[in-house]
Swiss-Prot record:
GO terms for cellular component: nucleus; tRNA-splicing ligase complex. Its cofactor is Mn(2+). It catalyses: a 3'-end 3'-phospho-ribonucleotide-RNA + a 5'-end dephospho-ribonucleoside-RNA + GTP = a ribonucleotidyl-ribonucleotide-RNA + GMP + diphosphate; a 3'-end 2',3'-cyclophospho-ribonucleotide-RNA + a 5'-end dephospho-ribonucleoside-RNA + GTP + H2O = a ribonucleotidyl-ribonucleotide-RNA + GMP + diphosphate + H(+). GO terms for molecular function: GTP binding; metal ion binding; RNA ligase (GTP) activity. Mn(2+) 2 binds at residues 123, 260, 354. Belongs to the RtcB family. The lineage of its organism: Eukaryota, Metazoa, Ecdysozoa, Arthropoda, Hexapoda. This is RNA-splicing ligase RtcB homolog. Its EC number is 6.5.1.8.
Amino acid sequence: MVVREYNEEMKYIERLSPNSFLIKKGFQSNMNVEGIFYANSRLEKLMFDELRNACRPGMTGGFLPGVKQIANVAALPGIVGRSVGLPDIHSGYGFAIGNMAAFDMSDPTSIVSPGGVGFDINCGVRLLRTNLFEKDVQPVKEQLAQSLFDHIPVGVGSKGIIPMNAHDLEEALEMGMDWSLREGYVWAEDKEHCEEYGRMLNADPSKVSLRAKKRGLPQLGTLGAGNHYAEIQVVEEIYDKYAASKMGIEELGQICVMIHSGSRGFGHQVATDALVEMEKAMKRDKIETNDRQLACARINSPEGQNYLKAMSAAANFAWVNRSSMTFLTRQAFAKQFNTTPDDLDMHVIYDVSHNVAKMEEHMVNGRPKQLLVHRKGSTRAFPPHHPLIPVDYQLTGQPVLVGGSMGTCSFVLTGTETGMVETFGSTCHGAGRSLSRAKSRRNLDYKDVLRDLEEKGISIRVASPKLVQEEAPDSYKDVRDVVQTCHDVGISNKAIKLRPIAVIKG
């Protein structure tokens, strides 16, 4: 690994625009393409401070700085375009979280890397709208928060309440939301408003280890811990009236529910299993990477194909999981307001993944190419008229759901043509950490965090209060900076801002 002083490092980084920076070849060894990252003045300071700290003598351990990780990904075989760092980027395993990279499927050397998807495969966000307003919910907010907390199993070891045996799990892994529909947990229209219609067709449960299945079986329909949550939110601002109305959001004060969850221990095990296999494949195929954490396999190798099939099964698990929680959320609201979910107009606006690798067609040097697009902490953001987005959103572009940190605002964005060209149809996914979990535990007190939420008028139900400081707003970048940066560089447009009034957490 190249070790240089900070001033030397900065010679390889060039400002392209007020909010974008080019990472030139040579910043890390063997770069096949350049890197780029997007950041406004506040976010760029975090990026460069991280790099400066890493240049100090004796600084070892932990993950590499985000800029280095972007450059190491740029050195992977078969990468096309640029290795992209989005404004919410922070260091992660192999790839930074908030890193997008696309690989040419016609190139026999191209790879797939579990580190480019993440351990929580198809961690993603679903947004439901309602016909309720803040004035309807405010008087019963505490009861409603409790009702949600009672209905949705949360926390690290939480067990699901959706009846599930081993045979059901096999079917769910293969069918995704089609299983949820057959079993009566979702409405038929929910699938239409879901990335991939809630089902990755190349899923193959036989490529998933027994251990992963054992971990996943009791966890279906559970929220999990970490940064996962269910939030009752209020529409606070509408930036794009036309796009909002297409999503069924007509007025300020309207109530929505956001569910942020993934594939739980199941996806984690799939990733862990794949990394072991890929280390062997790298030796056999003589694949060299700059960082051991970037374990990978040729896309067309048995290990590469097995991982993609198992990853797709984990993605289906996550969609079934969010669908089960949608069912439980609808039940909780219906019970509280003594009516039906239908009468409350509890429709799914959209469901997006922000940890996945997918085969997509994109233009590269003016020609269409099949690419394997890795999005880790990055959301698909396809433009208007794209064939893969629902009929309802053909004129607006795909909705993009960006969850803020706990107690801060969330946003709905829409995809753009610029994003299609610049980032292969990708944008940010959230606020992005500015403090590691360990630092958050050392520097913040969970009681202060809970008090702060109460002062903001946010009801909170949390399974593990002592984990709360890891997710405190002070542990994260400001999601407003992240979303505005994406808007300013044109890779997504702001449509709606949502403010939380109740949070359910693991």
